[in-house]
Every structure is written in structure tokens, then in C-alpha cells.
Amino acid sequence: MNSSRSTDTSPAQVRVTGWRVGAQTVSAILAIREASQLGLADAKGLVERVLAGAPIVLNVNNAESAQELVSALDRLKFDAQLVSH
């Protein structure tokens, strides 16, 4: 018998398109590392790309983690949204 759960465990994506005055870059790097399992250098490089004006797309483990990352990045003054499939 299959047990159905309401949490989506399929991979999800987050698009980060920009930043606002007061952006907390170090905290954003840490949040991205935690959600995406990237290393420090990779996460730092992605944040630097956003700061330079290039949007990025991050792969995360599931929709819940993706939503948490979007919320965290918003608090850190980065513009992010879930990528719909």
C-alpha cells in the first residue's frame, strides 16, 4: 500500500535575478551552499555573477528547500523566485 505525502521530493530550481541595496552577500553564499550542496567557491562565484547583473538558476533537492531559499534570499535583499516546470 502506497503512503502519499504532501511534500514534494522532486528536484526544484530557484532563479536569482538581481539584488537590492543592502544585499548581504556572505549570508547569501551560505544560504545557497546549504540549499544546493555547492562548495564555497561555486556558491561565491554564483553570487558574484548575480552582483554583476547576470541571472542564475540553482538546482535544489525539493520544492520545500527551494521555497525556503527564495524566502532567505529575499530577506538578504536578493531577488529570487521558484522556477515552474
Q: Where are each of the predicted segments found?
A:
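Short, amphipathic alpha-helical interaction segments embedded in low-complexity terminal/linker regions
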Residues: 1-85
